[in-house]
Amino acid sequence: MNALEEILDGVRADLAVRERETSLAALKQRVERVPDPRDALAVLRAPRVSVIAEIKRRSPSRGALATIADPAALASLYEQAGAAAVSVLTEQRRFGGSLADLDAVRVAVDIPVLRKDFVISPYQVLEARAHGADMVLLIVAALDQPRLIGLLERVESLGMTALVEVHDETEMLRALDAGARLVGVNARNLRTLEVDRETFARLAPMVPQGVLKVAESGVRGPRDLLQYAGAGADAVLVGEAAVTGGDPRQFVADLVTAGTHPATRIAH
């Protein structure tokens, strides 16, 4: 069993518990009470390389990363630093996240919020909207094609934006075939947990005009952002480096400054 399969086993077990605790009807009632989702695509289309900054306590590859007692405060720092969006990990077993983190972040910031999890069910999509998410991660490697298409349609039917994550050429073709408008290229292979920063440059040329590209994993600082920008990235998603560097606000601010560098506009 590879790393992704192990994570998905835990996700299914935890999902079954939540489905017993909170009915679909209750989730739908909650959706009716939350504010409309923000337009993440409009934000990420800005003439720069945008920064999506992540609330991340743990990872399967590194274990414990940071003690984040107040995710709302960290999200506010990210927003003050100029982040275009905040990513909130809600998977508990391997990443130490929760839907409570999503709730806290949603009320703390005015920028789009991404629910980052291993979404395999329409229930989780409705759950994301009920807890205020504007964006939902869909990982192609975790889904067959009919399920990917169905979940993407469900995300968009609720007014949210799907960030469709891929790791290789086959997955990129599947994402585009499903109708993804925002594609994330993860430099980390979720099956082996190894990072290859050349993955983005290899896959980006496959993406047609009008589909936005996010570089995920491997962003250690402005130099990596500029490298991804040169390969056509519209945004970068950064988690580990932001929470382990000691000054998350300054780290994100430095990335935001790099993202507005004239060289990034030339790359686009």
Swiss-Prot record:
Protein name (record): Indole-3-glycerol phosphate synthase
Keyword Nucleus annotated: no
- In which organism is this protein found? Parafrankia sp. (strain EAN1pec)
UniProt KW keywords: Amino-acid biosynthesis, Aromatic amino acid biosynthesis, Decarboxylase, Lyase, Tryptophan biosynthesis
What catalytic activity does the UniProt entry give for this protein? Answer: 1-(2-carboxyphenylamino)-1-deoxy-D-ribulose 5-phosphate + H(+) = (1S,2R)-1-C-(indol-3-yl)glycerol 3-phosphate + CO2 + H2O
- Gene symbol of the encoding locus: trpC
Which Gene Ontology terms cover its molecular function? indole-3-glycerol-phosphate synthase activity; phosphoribosylanthranilate isomerase activity
Family recorded in the similarity comment: Belongs to the TrpC family.
As recorded in UniProt, its EC number(s) are 4.1.1.48
The organism's taxonomic lineage, starting at the top: Bacteria, Bacillati, Actinomycetota, Actinomycetes, Frankiales
* EC class (word): lyase
Task: From the UniProt record, give the pathway where this protein acts.
Answer: Amino-acid biosynthesis; L-tryptophan biosynthesis; L-tryptophan from chorismate: step 4/5
Any GO BP annotation: L-tryptophan biosynthetic process
Q: Which InterPro entries match?
A: Aldolase_TIM, Indole-3-glycerol_P_synth, Indole-3-glycerol_P_synth_dom, Indole-3-GlycerolPSynthase_CS, RibuloseP-bd_barrel
- Among the Pfam families in the record, one is IGPS
